[in-house]
UniProtKB/Swiss-Prot annotation:
Xref: HAMAP family: RapZ_like (MF_00636)
Binding site for GTP: 58-61
Function: Displays ATPase and GTPase activities.
GO molecular function: ATP binding; GTP binding
InterPro entries named in the record: P-loop_NTPase, RapZ-like, RapZ-like_N, RapZ_C
Keywords of the record: ATP-binding, GTP-binding, Nucleotide-binding
UniProt-annotated binding residues for ATP: 9-16
Family indicated by similarity: Belongs to the RapZ-like family.
Protein's name in the database: Nucleotide-binding protein BAV3158
NCBIfam families: PRK05416.1
């Protein structure tokens, strides 16, 4: 069966990084292929005996984007193993990346009005509007806090895991950096006792045994984990029936170092029977409170 990966998302969110990783992993990759050629390209790839292809799609042809859901349906009807990944990032992060690269946004001309040139923020806002229908199609990865190496690792894990009906991901995050855009379910554990205020535990993370032992000693912590566990087990079958391929459960505390990391590790242990299961920790910085 031909494996097809479509990479789409906001310009500057890391599509080129993702495509290079796939190319290094043995995929035949095409960047910025016009959407009207996608079905034909996949058919030819299949006829030529290719096993893995990846295509990056952006908004250079915005008029075609409305057809992407139909194209995705057609590709699946062809019997391909299809994965669609949508990359996103905060507007501030995108603006910073454009400033560092000094690249021109692909929608600059389209967003401009008359003689007034559009600002970068205007271009990003227009692109979000154009891509909004696609964002809910498949798996979303928020690259705001990710290094290129982390993004490559996340894409590799996702592609390796994307063989089952539903990929379950648990990730911890820091509220001080904002709720990740790729979260389907969000649980706030800032109400739990905070190991940060114990000087011996402050430099550690929720993956370290002393922190785990400290948090495990509080009944309220165990009740919180039990409640999250029960909610997910109650509704996971329904998410699967909804033809969803991915479910990302995000758990946040103030700094993303102690409480959220511990809760995610405990949830991952409890759901270890689910295959595939991914665990991600967005922030584990020893100098920031959790």
């Amino acid at each position: 069966m031909l494996r097809v990966v479509l990479i789409t998302g906001i310009s500057g969110s890391g599509k080129s990084v993702a495509l290079r990783m796939l190319e290094d992993s043995g995929f035949t990759c095409v960047d910025n292929l016009p959407l009207r050629f996608l079905t034909e390209f996949v058919a030819v790839s299949h006829d030529d005996g290719m096993e893995r292809v990846a295509v990056a799609i952006d908004v250079r042809s915005p008029g075609e984007l409305a057809e992407l859901p139909n194209v995705i349906t057609a590709l699946r009807a062809m019997g391909t193993q299809l994965s669609v990944v949508f990359l996103d990032a905060s507007t501030e992060t995108l603006a910073q990346r454009y400033s560092e690269s000094r690249r021109r946004h692909p929608l600059t001309d389209r967003a401009s009005r008359g003689e007034k040139s559009a600002s970068l923020t205007d271009c990003i806002a227009l692109e979000r509007e154009l891509l909004a229908p696609l964002r809910d199609q498949e798996h979303v990865i928020d690259t705001t806090d990710l290094t290129p190496g982390q993004l490559r690792s996340w894409i590799r894990e996702l592609i390796d895991a994307d063989r089952a009906p539903l990929v379950l991901t648990f990730q911890s995050f820091a509220y001080k950096r904002g709720v990740p855009n790729d979260a389907d379910l969000v649980f706030d554990v800032r109400c739990l006792p905070n190991p940060y205020y114990d000087r011996n535990l402050r430099p550690l993370t929720g993956r370290d045994q002393p922190v785990a032992d400290w948090l495990a000693g509080f009944e309220i912590v165990q009740r919180m984990i039990d409640d999250i566990d029960g909610f997910i087990r109650r509704w996971l079958p329904q998410y699967t029936l909804d033809t969803r391929n991915y479910l990302t459960v995000a758990v946040g505390c103030t700094g993303g170092q102690h409480r959220s990391v511990y809760v995610v590790e405990e949830l991952a242990r409890r759901f270890s029977e689910h295959d595939p299961l991914l665990v991600r920790h967005r922030t584990q910085l020893p100098d920031e409170s959790a």
